[in-house]
A protein has these predicted regions:
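A structural signal for multi-pass alpha-helical bundles of membrane permease subunits
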Residues: 4-9, 14, 18, 22-313
Length: 313
């Protein structure tokens, strides 16, 4: 009596075929998802070059191509309600826009840069302290910060606004910087995890040589932390750059203090949408360019073995 042995070659071939079919199915699903995700972006870019006005455009590709939508963005600096009969808009040339887009760009850049610098510094210092220092109630403090970070910031928006009004910072760009930076320390988790990977022996060796904790952080640890610095800087820059919620509450009614997100939303009001929709598309494309360039330049720092071989055996 003989026992039939399984054909290993056939089994491997069958497994390879199944894996190939599964991979093809996955690629098809991913391709469909990419198309769904990228279609609105491509459409927005095309409409930013559209020479026609209106929202309900009949074709995906513009019938007439023009750069005028981008030029119009910077042809007017500040204006009152375009539906007001006394508005200066009625005396403007027809190719000028009733929205101070240039001012919005400047406001957004100022708020985003200062918020980024302050928030990055706070996050790095808090994360390093929690990574290296051992003190009473340390874990409780970390858990408390984690729980607080789960609550969305807009829950305290009204209270923060009232406080800013009381201290005389209502409708000021500086108040936005304070709001975006004040809760930065709660985002310590990722940076702390990175600092945990840097060997403590570096700190100990520096202490033996007479370095203070402050010198260790600035001179030794930070130069080894480019990836987390870049990550933190990008995330803290992107938040204020694209935020709408806080700006809409803090700066409502003063279009000279708007950031781009708030300003672009104003273009989509029923009374202005038809006239300025393609210009809105141009503004949306333009505001995405700095972030795209910034990420493209700095993404190489994301993958770096900065701690590999830092401690010699």
């Amino acid at each position: 009596m003989t026992t039939k042995q399984p054909n290993i070659g056939n089994m491997q071939a069958g497994y390879a075929k199944q894996r190939k079919i599964a991979n093809i199915a996955v690629y098809i699903i991913l391709s469909i998802m990419v198309v769904i995700w990228i279609f609105p972006i491509v459409w927005l870019v095309f409409q930013s070059f559209n020479g026609e006005k209106g929202v309900a455009l009949a074709t995906f590709f513009p019938k007439t191509w023009t750069f005028d939508n981008y030029i119009k963005l910077f042809r007017q600096e500040g204006l009152s309600d375009p539906m007001d009969p006394t508005s200066p808009m009625i005396v403007l040339p027809v190719d000028r826009m009733p929205f101070p887009y240039g001012r919005w760009i400047t406001n957004t850049f100022i708020v985003a840069v200062f918020s980024c610098l302050i928030s990055t510094l706070i996050i790095l210092m808090v994360s390093y302290a929690l990574s290296r220092l051992r003190f009473k109630s340390r874990k409780m403090l970390m858990n408390f910060g984690l729980i607080l970070g789960m609550f969305p910031g807009f829950m305290s928006m009204a209270a923060i606004y009232n406080i800013m009004e009381i201290i005389g910072l209502g409708k000021q760009l500086f108040s936005l910087v304070i709001v975006y930076s004040s809760g930065a320390g709660l985002g310590y988790q990722i940076a702390k995890g990175f600092f945990d990977t840097i060997p403590r022996s570096l700190d100990e060796a520096a202490k033996i040589d007479g370095a203070t904790r402050n010198q260790i952080f600035w001179i030794i640890i930070l130069p080894l932390s480019k990836p987390i610095i870049v990550y933190t800087a990008l995330t803290t820059f992107l938040g204020p750059w694209a935020d709408y919620v806080f700006v809409s509450y803090f700066m409502k009614g003063d279009d000279q203090k708007y950031t781009v997100a708030m300003g672009l939303y104003e273009m989509l009001k029923p009374e202005t949408m038809h006239e300025w929709f393609t210009v809105f598309c141009a503004g949306a494309v333009l505001i995405a360019v700095p972030i795209t360039i910034l990420f493209t330049i700095m993404q190489r720092f994301y993958v770096a073995g900065v701690t590999g071989g830092a401690v010699k055996g």
